Regions:
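Nucleic-acid-processing active sites and adjacent nucleic-acid-binding tracks
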Residues: 48-85, 218
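Conserved beta-strand -> loop -> alpha-helix junction used to position metal-binding or nucleic-acid-contacting
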Residues: 103-121, 129-130, 451-457
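Conserved catalytic core of nucleic-acid polymerases
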Residues: 215, 320-322, 326-329, 462-589, ...
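Short amphipathic alpha-helices in soluble, non-transmembrane regions
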Residues: 606-614
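Conserved "right-hand" nucleotidyltransferase catalytic core of DNA-directed polymerases
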Residues: 1-54, 134-137, 141-405, 414, ...
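Short hydrophobic/aromatic beta-strand micro-patches
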Residues: 498, 595-599
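Short active-site loop/helix that positions an aromatic residue
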Residues: 30-31, 91-103, 115-120, 260-267, ...
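Acidic beta-strand-to-loop metal/phosphate-binding motif
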Residues: 22, 83-93, 421-423
Length: 658
């Protein structure tokens, strides 16, 4: 029903009788935190929903049915009295509605897109409402969406829905509401069938936490963004001139075709081919080339991406309000977008030609090898030191604020005035969860050790080496590679590439590892056997993974990553509850790290308490959480030291009165 000024009172009287509303907003853009607003609100009540569209900001020149501002205020007052709000990607709608007066904090939130993720097979990748409707009810069911969007594009209304008449947008929005309710009912039945009710309840609480994190946002130092981008441009100019001088002519370094032609002029051929059989000049191919020009090309491209992706978009931003998706990954791990904080480089970047030490070169070789093997390639062990030096511009996580030739993307993110960013980082979380799945007396002792080096312990158990032995470092790295290879489902071929050994040697080392780490092989084989026989498996929280039988080897990854993710969610919920009556808040969760913005007056008291809350978990797995202060930005970390609140006194005799 398209609500008009004449039918508004009747519509409001009807919907206010229901404690649960399904909502969908139409907007003139996506930036709820900035310039954009709703142009209309879709509401559905009842399990066989009666739907309404309340138009408020459609252009009057196109449509004269807009309701009046006091009626929007009245609708928000009525919505504030309902107890439960349902939506598809509901946080998006709620941010816009809160800008109009909705009070979110006391509501039960049900995000249907999370329900869809919990009840879909692992090979499903598309979770938009349209894609889900097609997949669930067939192509015809989604025809309303396809035809409406086609009309919106044709009339150039697509980027700003307020330009579209309410008579077109209203029925479209109501249909979205109808299908959101239908999907909720159908998938709720499937959720109960698969006994994932507790998992969904966890996700419901997490939705509140993520909503508050998105709303607060993280401040950005846009002056640093401009400064760092300027430094990169200068460095790119140096590299570009060096490349052109070597090749003998100018060309577009970001063009794979022109790069290929330039390298061929130097007698360099690609050893990597595309699917169509053409020469490839991506990172994997450049890593095979024993010539400095290849390293400089990679350096130029990387710096170009840093500048365009992570610096220039923030020139005019004061804060970032990313979208956290608790439906974005199969395992249950959070993903984020606009921007994707999970992809922010942790390392700093060196904009200079400082020669590397032999130890540094070994580290660089390891990084290149890992990057190449991740794409199924083989690392060229014969790269000269001169070439390796050109690949050494990527540093580690120890960013030096005073070093003019260093930049860090994490340096962009700073605390508000009177606050401190504090990092709570789980130490070797996935390894701990992995070990807990086949916990025995030996593993139990290992898990309960303080400051334990699991990879070193695994090397001792599997290969009989001890710290201080000449080959300890080599076997520790091997144990680490096999541990994560098992968790991520890496086969012997890929493991061999990472270790720089043959496929057979990698297989032999893996067998030795399994033999030394008692219970690990039985666990791995049981997971593969269970998935192969029934096509699904559940993690320790009861989260279901529907896995194609030919991907059974990925089962361990789903269990370990999924359990780690659910522990993080559980603990974030507890920290969020703890902070409700305080000034401090959770800002960001990336991988196994949680960043909180803690008010300086609370820093001493609540930081240790947050650490304790994060270390606890309902599974009883011994976890360690490292605490560091990020000052003056996320890029620079130091051990947590309590701030002294005592006034500083100076003895009178120590003052120079002259």
């Amino acid at each position: 029903m398209l609500v008009t000024p004449d039918t508004y009172d009747e519509a409001l009287a009807y919907i206010k009788e229901y404690p649960t509303w399904t909502v969908d907003v139409e907007t003139n853009g996506f930036n709820w935190y900035d310039a954009n607003q709703i142009c209309g609100i879709g509401v559905g009540v009842g399990l066989e929903p009666k739907t309404f569209y309340f138009p408020f900001r459609h252009f009057p020149s196109i449509d004269s049915v807009n309701l009046h501002p006091p009626q929007l205020f009245q609708l928000m007052e009525t919505m504030n009295k309902c107890k439960t709000l349902i939506g598809y990607n509901v946080k998006f709608d709620l941010h816009f509605l809160e800008n109009e007066g909705l009070i979110v904090e006391d509501k039960t939130l049900i995000d249907v897109i999370v329900l869809i993720r919990l009840t879909e097979p692992s090979d499903v990748r598309e979770f938009s409402l349209t894609a889900t409707i097609k997949r669930t009810y067939g192509e015809e069911a989604a025809e309303y969406d396809i035809s409406t969007k086609k009309l919106l594009r044709k009339n150039k209304w697509y980027k700003d829905f307020s330009q579209a008449p309410a008579t077109i947008l209203g029925p479209y929005c109501e249909k979205d509401v109808e299908y959101t309710v239908k999907l909720y009912k159908d998938r709720l039945d499937k959720l109960h069938e698969t006994k994932q009710k507790k998992v969904f309840e966890l996700e419901q609480e997490l939705t509140h936490v993520l909503y508050d994190m998105e709303k607060r946002g993280i401040p950005v130092d846009n002056n640093y963004a401009k400064e760092a981008a300027g430094k990169i441009l200068q460095r790119q100019e140096q590299i570009k001139n060096r490349i052109f001088e070597t090749v003998g002519h100018e060309f577009l370094i970001t063009s794979p075709m022109q790069v290929g032609e330039a390298l061929k002029s130097l007698g360099i051929e690609s050893t990597v081919k595309t699917v169509k059989g053409n020469d490839s000049w991506g990172e994997e191919a450049l890593a095979q080339v024993n010539h400095p020009v290849a390293g400089y090309m990679r350096q130029y491209r990387t710096l170009d991406k840093l500048r365009a992706t992570y610096l220039e978009p923030y020139f005019d931003m004061n804060s970032v309000h990313t979208t956290f998706c608790n439906w974005g990954t199969l395992t249950g791990r959070l993903s984020s977008r606009n921007p994707n904080l999970q992809n922010l480089p942790r390392t700093h970047f060196k904009l200079s030609d400082d020669p590397l030490t032999d130890e540094d070169r070994d580290i660089v070789r390891g990084r290149i090898s890992a990057a190449v093997s991740a794409k199924g390639g083989t690392f060229n062990n014969n790269l000269s030191n001169e070439v390796i030096d050109t690949w050494g511009f990527i540093g580690d996580e120890s960013y030096n604020e005073q070093e003019e030739t260093q930049i860090s993307i994490r340096r962009l993110f700073v605390p508000r005035s009177d606050y401190t960013l504090v990092s709570f980082d789980y130490s070797q979380m996935e390894v701990r969860v992995f070990l807990d799945y086949f916990r025995n007396d030996d593993i139990d002792k290992l898990l309960k050790k303080e400051n334990v080096d699991f990879h070193g312990e695994a090397a001792t158990l599997a290969f009989g080496v001890k710290e201080g032995d000449s080959e300890y470092k080599y076997y520790r790295q091997m144990a680490k590679a096999i541990t994560f290879g098992t968790i991520y489902g890496i086969g012997a071929r890929k493991l061999g590439i990472q270790l720089g050994v043959s496929m057979q040697q990698a297989s032999d080392y893996k067998k030795q590892y399994f033999k030394g780490l008692k219970g690990s092989q039985e666990f791995f084989e049981k997971v593969v056997r269970v998935v192969s026989s029934r096509g699904w498996i559940k993690n320790r929280f009861g989260r279901l993974y529907i896995v194609p039988k030919d991907l059974a080897y990925k089962g361990v990854n789903y269990l370990v990553q999924g359990t780690s993710a659910d522990i993080l969610s559980e603990r974030m919920i507890e920290v969020h509850k703890y902070l409700q009556d305080k000034k401090s808040e959770i800002l960001v969760q990336v991988h196994d790290e949680i960043i909180c913005e803690i008010h300086n007056t609370e820093l001493n008291d609540i930081t240790p308490n947050i650490q304790k809350l994060l270390q606890k978990n309902s599974l009883g797995i011994p976890l360690e959480v490292d605490v560091e202060m990020c000052s003056p930005s996320w890029a620079t970390k130091q051990d947590f030291t309590p701030i002294s609140n005592e006034p500083s006194y100076v003895e009178e005799w120590a003052i120079d009165w002259s």
